Every structure is written in structure tokens, then in C-alpha cells.
Amino acid sequence: MATTTSHATNTWIKTKLSMPSSKEFGFASNSISLLKNQHNRQSLNINSSLQAPPILHFPKQSSNYQTPKNNTISHPKQENNNSSSSSTSKWNLVQKAAAMALDAVESALTKHELEHPLPKTADPRVQISGNFAPVPENPVCQSLPVTGKIPKCVQGVYVRNGANPLFEPTAGHHFFDGDGMVHAVQFKNGSASYACRFTETERLVQEKALGRPVFPKAIGELHGHSGIARLMLFYARGLFGLVDHSKGTGVANAGLVYFNNRLLAMSEDDLPYHVKVTPTGDLKTEGRFDFDGQLKSTMIAHPKLDPVSGELFALSYDVIQKPYLKYFRFSKNGEKSNDVEIPVEDPTMMHDFAITENFVVIPDQQVVFKMSEMIRGGSPVVYDKNKVSRFGILDKYAKDGSDLKWVEVPDCFCFHLWNAWEEAETDEIVVIGSCMTPPDSIFNECDEGLKSVLSEIRLNLKTGKSTRKSIIENPDEQVNLEAGMVNRNKLGRKTEYAYLAIAEPWPKVSGFAKVNLFTGEVEKFIYGDNKYGGEPLFLPRDPNSKEEDDGYILAFVHDEKEWKSELQIVNAMSLKLEATVKLPSRVPYGFHGTFINANDLANQA
């Protein structure tokens, strides 16, 4: 994909929107004001899921597809008249006729869907309300106001990914369906700048050129018979050369990792995208990145960077055909290993995993993909209550899966794993993760309240048995902990502390907790009255420091009363606020981030 020099904005949604309550997140709300495509939604019995097929196996692509050249967009309505006509003018008569017919079918399908109420997990009036709503791109703003003093060690750029739909949803939409947008705060000599840009995925480039969304939304739309119909529509558009799915369909909105001199934006439905930070602090998409032709499959959004070897470890899953799950690694120079097939009976939701000094720890849990459920009118993502969760343990440098050991961990679903390490004296691997109940609570509507319990899971390599306990033993101190990290210089090694978002009132984040993983002691930092944020990022003050918590926590925070956003920098040892950077525009709640130090920035590929 050619790098674009122009940028997109989305102006279809008003800036200041009220939030649904934590109890009713996902229930229909009239607080969001869409500027077009208003519909009276009445009923549609859709079960929502976190992930739909990350790999779609399409028939051969027509050679008639013309890559759009006009990627500029300032407003969707204008785009429909300008770059849309530029793109469609290259179509032949057959393509134009096919486009009209398929558009008519899609309009009828959407009208039918919107005659029924959307579930709260797929209703855009809920999923992207309040500060979950998208924002336009923001060019670099320099010399931002700072309260307090930025620590000297904070030199580089903090980047955070998130979902930010460019176009107004026309039907079902889950928050996770949005286009990827990276927010960046660069620090130079005590001064800070801010910018946010869309990651210019192949999907986004084509939709910008057409002036509307045409790619299926994995969570909000691909359910039941209507989901099958939308897939067939997309296949048909590909066969006629109206869209090109051969270069991926992903949104790159979840994870970020800096590896081998490249910042990679990731979601598990595609290859990573290379995003470059410019000297001024702006962001520029370099393109879809396949590691010089070595990576032929998707890669999950949470690869693990070993702090000692510099290697990157990753997984890839396929929901259609075997092998359903593969493991691979990259040397610190970016050389890929052969794939190792991980034998699993069903394609499994695989958002995260863990590494130790010598092993990889691979969860095979109860949330699975069953595409046949769409034929029955349901979601392809299923909570299989008859399945027993288990963790696979494999040597990091294994050439095949013959020595893979499985240890069952009943009734355990960890969406994220924060760390793992080996304890040789007991022949155990200790895994730290947040166990979520109900397992499908962020996928489907349910009456039971979500609980995310920070847990210690011990996998005994000798006996093949496991134990699991809550790290915070006092029930009065128990809080939902999701999104966070340990000191990444200690990843795969025994760590004393974890820094995790306090996901209360769900789904908002009121602060972060510093948890002693040995004693269960909890220290909390609350962002402030009417202030909510996201994932806390731990930045070590000195990589060689003997104190594990010697560093700072960085987090985007939004004031829902004043409707202003800021970046807070907190001393990780004392939990005292060191500095606040006032941001020029709103930063929506998002997903995961990383920090790139100044030396690495200077050496970007």
C-alpha cells in the first residue's frame, strides 16, 4: 500500500456525548446524535461476539479491481461525491451494474435489520457513545501546557491504539469494530506534543475512496443469517473487482509493539501495519508489514518481546481450516522461525498468551469459534460450557508440537495474561492473569455482572495439575482489574508488581491499581472526580535500576464534566502525580499502548 500524504477526518458525530451508566452499558441510549442515517431500530436477535473470523477465505480476486488513488476525505458526504466518483469511474459497465445491484441488496438487508432492535453489544448508539465516540485526526500540536514537571527520563513518545470508526455505522457496530487510530504524545527536553492519526489500512483506504463502509464488521454484523448475507455480498463485490480483499481486511486497532526498529499496529484479523513516528511527532502509515515476505498469516495483537534476547514471540489462529493455531518467533533481527502447529480440537479465541525464560504458555479456553452457528441464526463465537480450559506449555525454541504439555485449569477464562515465570523448586510455571466471568460477558448480552479477578495460576509440570487463587484475598478489596502490565524489563521473569486498570464502574476506568503479586497488597491511584482513563503504561526510570517499581505510570485521562483530555504521569513508587499534559483535543477510551525511547525513535526503519 502506498503511503498517503493526506489525512482523513470524520465529522458525522457530535463531539460532546453523554455516557450510558455502567450497569446499562450497551442498552439503547438516545444520548448519541448521529448526523446521518438515522433509523428507528426495533428488533434484531443478534448475539454479539468479541471476534469474528480473523481469516476470511475468499474465492479468487477479479483482476479488474482498480486501486483507488484519491485517499483524501474531509467529510463522508463530500467523499460520496468526490473520491467515490473518482474510484467508480474506472469501473466497466458490468462492474457498475453489479455495484448497483449489490448496493440495492445491501440497502434492503440493512432496512430489514433495523426494523428490529439491535442488542446492546451491537448498537452503535451505545457502543460509541460518550467518550467511546470517535474523533477526527489531529495534526501535531507542539509545546502543550504542562502542570508539574515532566521527569527527565521521559524522553521519547507514548503511543496508544484504539478503535475509531471513520464512517457512521449503517447497522450493527461493536466498539471493537472501529478503524485503528494511534494517539501519540512526544516528549523532548521537558516539552510535549500531541497528534492522532488513523492507521491507513487497506480496508480504510478502500472505504475512504468509496466514501462509505463496505467491509463487514467482524463483531457488529457477522451474526446469524444476516451475517452470512453480508459475507456473500462482500465475496460478490470482490469477484466483480469492486473491492480488493487480497491485501487483508483488518483494522489494526488493538495492540502496539516496537520491534526491529518499527512500530507495529496490530489486530488479530490481519498482518501488522508499520507506523512511523516523524521527527515532529506526527504519525505516518508505511503500510502492511509482512516481515519482508516471511509472514503469511495473521498475528495476534499481543506478541511478546523478550527483554533479554530481544526476540518476538507470537501466535496466529484460523477459524476456518486447520491448523487452527500456530506458534512462531522472530529473531531480534526480524528473521522468522518455521511455524509450529498447536493441536487444538476447535478454533479458539486466542487474544493473548505468555512467555517465561524457557517456555511459551498458550491458553486453550472455553470461548471457541463455530461457524455452523451462523447457519442456525446465532453467533460464530460460542462459550462452550462442556469444554475444560487448559494451558499448553511448549519450549520456546521447539521445532514442532510433539513435546507440548497440557495442564487443565477448569472454569478459567483469561482475556489477558500479565506475566508468567518458572519456579524450578516446585516444577511449576506461575501465570498471572485476570480471570473473567462470565467468560462471554464482553461478547454477548447477559444479566450477570462482569467480574475480572486478578489470579495466580500454578501449572505443575511434574504432576500435570493446576491450582488457581485470587491474588487479592480480602473480598472487601476485590476490584475488577483489566488492561495493564508489569515492568516489561521483567517480562517472563518473576515480578513483584502489576499495574492494572480499575475497570469500575464498568466499562469505564476510574484509576489504576499497583498490586503486590506476592502479598496481595493493593495501592490505588484514582484519576479524579468525573475523570476516567484506560490502560496504565509503566515506564522504567532506569532499565538497570534494582527496584522493580522505579519508574512512572503514563495514562490518558478524560474529564467527563469539562470534556477535556490530558495525559497523567504518576510516580510508580509513591503513586504521586508528577505532571499533567493538557491535550488539545479529546482522546477517546481505547486499548493498548507502548513507549518508544528517543534513541529508538532516531533509529526507526
Curated annotation (Swiss-Prot):
Coiled coil: none annotated. It comes from Solanum lycopersicum (Tomato). It holds the Pfam family RPE65. Residues 60-75 have a biased composition (Polar residues). InterPro entries: Carotenoid_Oase (IPR004294). The lineage of its organism: Eukaryota, Viridiplantae, Streptophyta, Embryophyta, Tracheophyta. Binds 1 Fe(2+) ion per subunit. This is 9-cis-epoxycarotenoid dioxygenase NCED1, chloroplastic. Its main location: plastid.
